[in-house]
Amino acid sequence: MRPIRMYKNNQERTTTKHQETIEDNQNEQTTSDQRFTRSSNSGKINVERISSSRHQIADGKTMSSYTTNEANYTSKDSVQHGGSSITYTSNTTGNPRVTNARANIDETYATGTVEDLSSTSHGQEPEIESFADRAELAMMIQGMTVGALTVQPMRSIRSTFANLANILIFHDVFATEDKPTSSIEYHSDEMVVNMPKQTYNPIDTVAKILYLPSLEKFKYGTGIVQMNYSSNVSQLFPNTTNIINTITDGLTYANRTEFFIRVMVLFMMDRKILTMDFYDVDASAISNNAILPTIPTITGVSPLLRIDTRTEPIWYNDAIKTLINNLTIQYGKIKTVLDANAVKRYSVVGYPIDQFRAYLYNHNLLEYLGKKVKREDIMSLIKALSYEFDLITISDLEYQNIPKWFSDNDLSRFVFAVCMFPDIIRQFHALNIDYFSQANAFTVKSENSIIKMLNSNQNMEPSIINWFLFRICAIDKTVIDDYFSLEMTPIIMRPKLYDFDMKRGEPVSLLYILELILFSIMFPNVTQHMLGQIQARILFICMYAFRQEYLKFIAKFGFFYKIVNGRKEYIQVANQNERMSENVDVLTGNLYPSLFTDDPTLSSVAPTLAKIARLMKPTTSLTPDERAISAKFPRFKDASHLNPYSSLNVGGRTQHSVTYTRMYDAIDEMFNLILKSFANNFAQRPRAGVTQLKSLLTQLTEPLCLELDGHVYHLYNVMANMMQNFIPNTDGQFHSFRACAYAVVDSGNIYRVVQNGDELNESLVIDTAIVWGLLGNTDNAYGNAIGATGTANVPTKVQPVIPTPDNFITPTIHLKTSIDAVCSVEGILLLILSRQINIPGYEVELDKLRIGISQPKVSERQYQRARESIKNMLGSGDYNIAPLHFLLHTEHRSTRLSKPLIRRVFDNVVQPYVANLDPAEFENTPQLIESSNMTRLQIALKMLTGDMDDIVKGLILHKRACAKFDVYETLTIPNDVQTIVLTMQHISTQTENNIVYYVFLINGVKIFAEDVKNINFQVDTTGIWPEHVVTLLLRAINNGFNTYISMPNILYKPTITADVRQFLNTTKAEVLLVSNRSVIHEIMFFDNALQPKKSSDTLALSEAVYRTIWNSSVITQRILARGLMNLEDNKPPEAKISQQSELDMGKIDETSGEPIYTSGLKKMDSSKISMFNVVLSAGSDVIRQAAIKYSAVRTQEVILFE
């Protein structure tokens, strides 16, 4: 968090102010944000303009108090408050123009320069799209019911919120598509041969539309038809290795693993729901009974959609008909499923699409339709984000599919995300700032009252004027919103206290202690997280101001104490002149600052120091996060927050607030100390000036504290229950507070929620001087309403704003969705790159994915590469749009994981899981993948590891003349061939005619390569042989007799074609022998076994006569058809047709959407690919954004005007 204004040193501060003064004289603009400098010659305090910046979200990064980046901007924000639409425009001065657009209140007041309202508006009434027009929503409200909420006695008040009905739009992550997209599709190769002219039977127009795509794919002359990944899947295969570096280029298991990861992410993030259009056909024009009267407008492709056309080859049609005799196959709309009110939910459709895409469509639709969010859940969600005295009612939910914002193990995923991706806190803070800024609690005045008083007071001590001149600097609404929001934002690293000269030994040094006390009263959570630094500064001042007390204090209490077995052990200070370091961690370890001990003897040993500590300590108590728990937001056991303020239920200024009493006491005590301790420094006139300053500060404190207790108190009650604020803030016990102790622990590494160590967060710099700006430079909503602040102190009687939940429900749900997505990605990485985590029932599939990847070989940098690769798939955006871009940055603590656990860590010691202390979900490895995402992941796993897994092991090099190439032919080495497992012991030399030749040494006999016969050289590992050995082997297979080189462990990806025009025989035997064993070779195989005779095209292929590279394993599992031609009107012997598993539509489990074969076998349990399935198609009126009306009746206003 940036300070109000940061300078490297006083010289820079003076220079910068001088430059800005010159710039201001050149800019004649009206402004209301001020900064103050002291004129070098007049002794007066001049006012000059500064530019402020408001947090914004750009390129996935929040520029707010958690970053040092700033950007000037003009934005328009709209806050719906009951019937009001309160719009403010922030200009470059940070001052808002506020327009109250409520129907019965027409007031406009400006606090600064007015800019054009050009930016996106938040909180405006959403546009109602066709799925829920205004007439529908007007009817929806008729079913509203009152939620369970304690109703306060109604009294006659001026309400700005009564009987309000708002529309809540729940933006879902599901999307629709009317054109089915397969994950697997047919690919056909046409043979280029001389063949008899094919005969086509005529078909009518309707049949031509229905059958033509399938006739083109399975036409006469087709050599082979095989299954390939569709373009949307295949494009994910990396061109180069991006994750796991290898020593060679080309395709490797690293590429393959990265491809698997990308496909799993693609499936896991998929939320597409099919909404097909249909048309009716004349049944009399179609002879196939499997084709139903209502069919999709997008025609599918399948052998089943050509078999009744009587188109050549007829034998193929007849063979398919025989094949499917006992199978369940239908094309088109099978039935329509209605709900209890006879409203269409979805159509059950038979369609040629692979079972994986069909299952994914079905799963998405059923998840969407099955989101059973109960009425009380919606009520709890709205209440969690609402003013506590709003009586909530909502409309009927019967036709609404509201996205769930809760699931099992949410807390684990939130904790994991914060530990491993700490930048997420920026988004948490951005949400809090959005909320607080919309409340418009503070406005900035045109001049600072403290400066004004000092400017006009002739009795003021010059050192005090200079001190305030130094401390009071820029303040704007952005800074104010930042600081107040930080009280509820989880702080995960010790903030850095802004450095400056504390003027030790001078009276003004006690003003700095007063500043720290006032800051602690207003911001105890931030204070708690930098308590060590604050103590160091207080003791540094007291070392000179109250030296005797200081010496007694450190002699008895030291700087720190530990708690051992429930007892305090104070650490003695050896050197009484030693200054306490600000860098010691008193937040996460077992050190506590002694100044804030609860030891009762402190007041007798060092009464002044005890008084300072007492003034700083919070007096309020913890409030349970009951509404957050009811809304099913992630929370720890006994979750609570400290609201630093106390409720103020009386309008007007006749009763001082509790916070005012504390601040009054602090000002009174510290000024008495100033006058007492530095009596010799003040003559009579300066002493009177100090008294007048004290009186002014006391006067300014009252309206500020009215706002804190009367308005901000209620804002904090809402913010404490927001989803993102799941980590408790301070408990108010400065003597014993420990930050959240949970951490992700893995293989001896600890990644904490709250980071420890002596390093401070340089990006979260706190300047406690904000208290002087709040006192002297602001008006506030509560004060304006009752006439304590504002223009001429005239009461406006406009209720302070409590933002309505409209603007925060969607960001809240999307934040949860984004964390689920990022944790799911991490879950995928753990599943593949770690062998210690499995999915029950999917061990075999995961083992296939892990081939070639062993955990010790996956470095931390490679893990980071994997995250970055996936990040690029997710895209970027803020919490309203897309998964969080920056969450996958790994510069901080993200590292390679093996089997992470969430555990408490005390004093760097990992604590065991304790059932009555720790959440149950922390007992085992966190479930990073949400259950619905797990189903999508399992679908991808099955697709990747079944017949579509095209990596084959085992090749044989053997040169043989071939009339035809048949990919179904697997080379088998004859039994009479001797197999030698090749080693360097089988290589020798022989000298002839004074020339040394390399030869083979087989059975003790030296043999030239050309003389080798009936030998199989088994090469278990490639890429390790010297050049002369490779040369010998190649000469043996080229010139020897019946010689083989078998490579049982070599990996390759076969590509098959029957089209001679596509065949590129680029793989050389030498390359196979010299390539590293991790390489996966891409080898094209030519299939021309069905040529009726050698054609001129075939003879033109230079290597068609000889074949050297042979597969020793089956490579044809993807081939679905072969040889669609006639041999004298009959089926050629080498021709192939589909298997039943490909064409068996079967049925589905309508509970889960999982495809099932006619036999009852689940298709996910088979390695075979089914290209005809039952898919669910939703009606266009079913898939729509949920829109409900809610009404909030305010039973008690913020201010109860008399």
Curated annotation (Swiss-Prot):
The protein's assembly and partners: Homodecamer; each decamer is made up of two conformers of VP2, called VP2A and VP2B. 12 homodecamers assemble to form an icosahedral capsid.
Compartments where found: Virion
Function per UniProt: Inner capsid protein that self-assembles to form an icosahedral capsid with a T=2 symmetry, which consists of 120 copies of VP2, with channels at each of its five-fold vertices. This capsid constitutes the innermost concentric layer of the viral mature particle.
Gene Ontology, cellular component aspect: T=2 icosahedral viral capsid; viral inner capsid
InterPro entries, A to Z: VP1/VP3_C
Biased composition (Basic and acidic residues): 10-21
UniProt name for this protein: Inner capsid protein VP3
Additional detail: Function inferred by structural homology with BTV-fold inner capsid family.
Pfam families membership: VP1-like_C
Gene label: S3
Family: Belongs to the turreted BTV-fold inner capsid family.
